[in-house]
Structure formats: C-alpha cells, structure tokens
C-alpha cells in the first residue's frame, strides 16, 4: 500500500517514490544567504542579516559565531536549531583540547557537527535523544589548523564538503556563479573580503549596509578570528564597486 504525499511529508526518514526526503528539503528552504571565501592567508565569511522590522535591534541578530578561538561558523537558517549545533561543536572542541592538549582539527569538528545533524527521526530502540525533524540550518565553518586555512559547508542532510569559495541559501546559484568566475587561489585576504561582499551585494534584495551584513575573517598569521564592527565594515563597503 502506497503512502500519500502528506504521509511522506511527515515521515522524516521515509523516502518518497522519487527518492526524496521532504523534511530535509523543507529544512534546506529555511536557509538564507551566506558566503565564504578561502585563500592562503585565511578565510572570510559574509552573511546577510535580514531585518524583518525597523524596530528590531540589528546587533541582536548574530550570524557569525565562535566555536573555538581557531574556528568560526556562519549560520544560515533557523537560529534555534543552529544554537543546538554550535553548543555541541563547542563541547566537542573543548573536550578535545582537555583530553589531548591541542586544538581540534577543522575537519574533525565538522564531522562531529554532521554526526549530530544525522540524529533525527523516530527513536524507538535507542536511549539517545533525537530531533523529530532535520536541523533547518546550513553552516559555513572556517578554521585554521596544521593543514592551514580551510572552509567547509554542511547542510541539514548531514553532508559536508570542503570548498575554496561557497555561497549558501537564497540566491546562492547566482552568487556561486560569480564566485566561480572571479575566485583565484592567489587572492589576498583583503581581496577575499571584497569578493565576498561584492557577491553578496549582487544578490541581496536590499542595499548592503553595516546593519544588514556581518563580516568576519580568520587569518593564518593571527591564528584567531575577528568579527568586524560597524566602522570597520563601513570602510570595506566603501571599497566596493
């Protein structure tokens, strides 16, 4: 007996006859726009902060967060879901540092995030807690380790991939095309900032300002991240074409 479309919609671990998991697809639809660009010097993350009301305080919306001093993450999607994942990643990195007296590798951190992302669905025979649906958030994880700067993308399906430059969320198809045309491994960190914001500017519905965009960098020289304040962000925006 075949299931109806609505039953496939509700089933978080039931594939449709076309091989689709609708709950994962719905989670992907919740993702907004974010861009990451990696070069030899470090990684740049730029994320749109969509303000739904003029009464909203822009500083209360945080789209780039710290996982560890050498790891940052741009989140796109449901913030409550992202908080659960980020808290998990922070615990994993601190446990690794406590046990091995060294910072956790970027890929290892991403792997732990994606392991958590896969824990959804019915929980009949396991003692572990699970989400009843996929996490509605995608992440761009940037970090520095012994391999140098790296940029990873993870989506609600629990898949992760390493990129030199990546756009996620609404309008990401056009943004990714721009990145493919203009990206070069020889870019400096300043040029990566400009490329990320220029690409963001092209696909955003509103004019880019210091209140609707968040910019962060993590550099190999400093081995730590920096989130730009309004004055620093305004200086970079002024250089855009």
Swiss-Prot record:
Keywords: Cytoplasm, Nucleus, Proteasome. GO terms for cellular component: cytoplasm; extracellular matrix; nucleus; proteasome core complex, alpha-subunit complex. GO terms for biological process: proteasomal protein catabolic process; proteasome-mediated ubiquitin-dependent protein catabolic process. It comes from the Eukaryota. The keyword Methyltransferase does not apply. It is found in: Cytoplasm; Nucleus. The proteasome is a multicatalytic proteinase complex which is characterized by its ability to cleave peptides with Arg, Phe, Tyr, Leu, and Glu adjacent to the leaving group at neutral or slightly basic pH. The proteasome has an ATP-dependent proteolytic activity. NCBIfam families: PRK03996.1. PANTHER family: PROTEASOME SUBUNIT ALPHA/BETA. This is Proteasome subunit alpha type-5. The lineage of its organism: Eukaryota, Amoebozoa, Evosea, Eumycetozoa, Dictyostelia. The gene is psmA5.
């Amino acid at each position: 007996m075949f299931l109806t479309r609505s039953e496939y919609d509700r089933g978080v671990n039931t594939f449709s006859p076309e091989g689709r998991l609708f709950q994962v697809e719905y989670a992907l639809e919740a993702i907004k726009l974010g861009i990451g660009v990696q070069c030899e010097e470090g990684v740049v993350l730029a994320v749109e902060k969509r303000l739904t009301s003029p009464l909203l305080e822009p500083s209360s919306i945080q789209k780039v967060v710290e996982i560890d001093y050498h790891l940052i993450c741009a989140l796109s999607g449901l913030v409550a879901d992202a908080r659960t994942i980020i808290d998990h990643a922070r615990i994993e990195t601190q446990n690794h540092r406590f046990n091995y007296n060294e910072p956790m590798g970027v890929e290892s951190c991403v792997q732990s995030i994606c392991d958590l992302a896969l824990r959804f669905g019915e929980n009949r025979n396991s003692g572990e807690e699970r989400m009843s649906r996929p996490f509605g958030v995608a992440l761009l994880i940037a970090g520095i380790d012994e391999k140098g700067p790296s940029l990873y993308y993870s989506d609600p399906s629990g898949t992760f991939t390493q990129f030199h430059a990546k756009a996620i969320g609404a309008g990401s198809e056009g943004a990714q095309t721009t990145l493919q045309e203009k990206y070069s491994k020889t870019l400096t960190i300043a040029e990566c900032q400009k490329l990320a914001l220029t690409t963001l500017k092209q696909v955003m519905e509103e004019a880019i300002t210091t209140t609707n965009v968040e910019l962060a960098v993590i550099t190999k020289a400093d081995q730590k991240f920096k989130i730009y304040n309004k004055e620093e962000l305004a200086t970079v925006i002024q250089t855009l074409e």
